[in-house]
Amino acid sequence: MQELYNPSEIEALVQKHWHEHKTFEVTEDESKEKFYCLSMFPYPSGRLHMGHVRNYTIGDVVARYQRLQGKNVLQPIGWDSFGLPAENAAINNKASPAPWTYENIDYMKNQLKLLGFGYDWSREIATCTPEYYRWEQWFFTQLYAKGLVYKKTSSVNWCPNDETVLANEQVQDGCCWRCDTEVIQKEIPQWFIKITDYAEELLNDIDTLDGWPEQVKAMQRNWIGRSEGIEMTFAVADSDASFDIYTTRPDTLMGVTYVAIAAGHPLAEQSAQNNPELAAFLEECKNADTTEAAMASMEKKGVATGLQAIHPISGKLVPIWVANFVLMNYGTGAVMSVPAHDQRDYEFATKYQLAIEAVIKPVDGEVDVSKEAYTEKGVVFNSGDAFPELDGLDFQAAFEAIDARLTAEGKGKRQVNYRLRDWGVSRQRYWGAPIPMVTLADGTVVPTPEDQLPVILPEDVVMDGIQSPIKADKAWAETTVNGQPATRETDTFDTFMESSWYYARYCSPHADEMLDPAKANYWLPVDQYIGGIEHACMHLLYFRFFHKLLRDAGLVNSDEPAKQLLTQGMVLADAYYYTNEKGARVWVSPLEVTVVEKDDKGRIIKAIDNQGHELVYTGMSKMSKSKNNGIDPQVMVEKYGADTVRLFMMFASPPELTLEWQESGVEGAHRFIKRFWKLASDHVAAGKTEALDTSKLNADQKALRRELHKTIAKVSDDIARRQMFNTAVASVMELMNHLLKASQETAQDRALLAEALSAVTRLLYPIVPHMTFTLWNELGNEGDIEDSRWPEVDESALVEDSKLIVVQVNGKVRAKITVAADASKEDVEALGMSDEHVQKHTEGLTVRKVIYVPGKLLSIVAN
């Protein structure tokens, strides 16, 4: 065995062995318990970043641990390879996104292999290939046949100059990223999948996700947003028209003083025909940002329509206003406004001098709405002659009373609503899977016939940055269906479509069908899923929804796609910049910082880069291109080895918290690996050891063996149950300190070290697999470490024959005594009192009290 640890040589040899022996390729095996471990697959952006490395190291640790538990472990990998970044790169290079994407896949695949991740590469998928998206297209046509797909108009960002749709990322300060034209909102037809049909099940089944973080479950509950309320009808005065309103606070109904409708509401458009001020306001609203963040912060504005609504109970007339805070695609596009009991309504009413009438007050006091709305649930008052029975009722009683009356009069009904909207899957982009729908000559829209699937996206195109190549390619759009001329849909799927079912395709990636049900039902659900919490309300919700669609299509037999979810934290790094002669910030990579001075608390107070610029240090922030503080994993692997990078990633922080990148920590991880290697090397060099005879161990040897088996127990629990990989590593490091100090004089000393090295090699294997793979055979074990078993705890080793008792006299430690583990209180007292140090400090004193804390402390009080 070589004495010095050489990571580049070791890792190359081990990776070659894994490749040649197809170590991580698996098939279904009913005789074994399966374990499916999956990390969210990457977008092939060009290079791995440390966030990827953290995610995939966590997954690899879990997978390798489960393999040593004797399970049949599937850990696949692939590429989420459609999307806007490839289009942008192609536009910059006046090329096609396809070659850029495939080159990036090749490069990043090599990076993943250098890090030693134990993937089954035979199952590799790329979502941009027809072999993959063919089945997505097929499934979409099945959903259409079941009535779960429909088309309607929806708002998009539109550049009037380029006459093209823009993604949110392509809108910069309200203008087109390419030509700086002001962006407007435009209604265009788009395809939707009815996720709302599954809203109740998606919400209820959150309660079954015992292995998911509570934060993710809470975010999904809020996103689905179930509410119970009443939908009621308001008639329009002097008209046959009426409109519906939904409210979760029917107890405030008698306080309605105006109604607000969306700019896209039919009544708004009708009223604007003879109202230039309103028409201009509707145009302004069309171009407004309607994201939640923008809606929350924007100025609330409105224009009166001139119409009045009839209150469904009192018959009172209330004005109808168009307001920019009401959206047509949320609820009914109209809200009843009760300014006394809703702060937004209050501010609007104050601004436009509308009436404010309080109808709810605290149970035990009066209400004051002179400065702000009273928004709590209290008791009803001031209901007027139309419904005096409401006065004095609490929220629930008032809800029931109003529901009963409106239902009886045919003016309303109780209803459950969801905040969740149907999933818009159309994208007016090129680099995505074509939506498999066609329009016939008579205008009928039908699915592409199955024998014409896949609808292949042409890859030999040039991006001009203005129009999608398939929208410009009339020849591509022209087709025939059943002998009739037809035109293809030129929108492509939202890329969340591909990432919603990839986990299932891994089970049978080469099948000539969407899924092989037998294989899918062997592997699914995923046992451990790993990815960022930023995906809680989009990918992770669509992921769950798609699984239920697959179940209802008879392709899988489980209700949820993943049993356990781990959401890893971000990776942070130091960020530095200097200001150039133009006054712009120039961000400098931490790797280019050559001088760093710190104060006595370790805070950076001065930094200089390799060009001599004095830098401003802005603290730790998420690794990003914009701050140039990303650390290239490949540079670190070349410098320290993959095992060191993996060890640092696991040791530096609990997995769900942020990880602060510190090269000093990487160096520390490297030193630990080298120490362990040397300990093993010295042991091997000393020759063979005799068998361990636990009956012959002395007290020190028993204590060391106890530490070993306590460590095995703790590391097992940390990895399997707690998923606290950092404390698992810390426990092994602590054990290492004991091993380095242990005597090596006798044959039993060396036999005990052999047991410890064998166990620690396996404990470290999931985290540092290359070094431990090599050591396993060097230590005299047969076969590959992947085929070994996780070390078992010897419960007898944990039993202590003796205890070390601290003896205090008047609160000060005066002695430490060793007693039999089963010694009685009387025996311990007698032994403690006979100790020469205790006698010295009690001489001439009267012992007043003796307190014994079993197995730990003997406290003597004397004066």
Swiss-Prot record:
This is Leucine--tRNA ligase. Keywords: Aminoacyl-tRNA synthetase, ATP-binding, Cytoplasm, Ligase, Nucleotide-binding, Protein biosynthesis. HAMAP family: Leu_tRNA_synth_B. A motif ('KMSKS' region) lies at residues 622-626. It comes from the Bacteria. It comes from Shewanella frigidimarina (strain NCIMB 400). The gene is leuS. NCBIfam families: leuS_bact. Disulfide bonds: none annotated. A motif ('HIGH' region) lies at residues 42-52. Gene3D superfamilies: 2.20.28.290, 3.10.20.590, HUPs, Isoleucyl-tRNA Synthetase, Domain 1, Valyl/Leucyl/Isoleucyl-tRNA synthetase, editing domain. Its main location: cytoplasm.
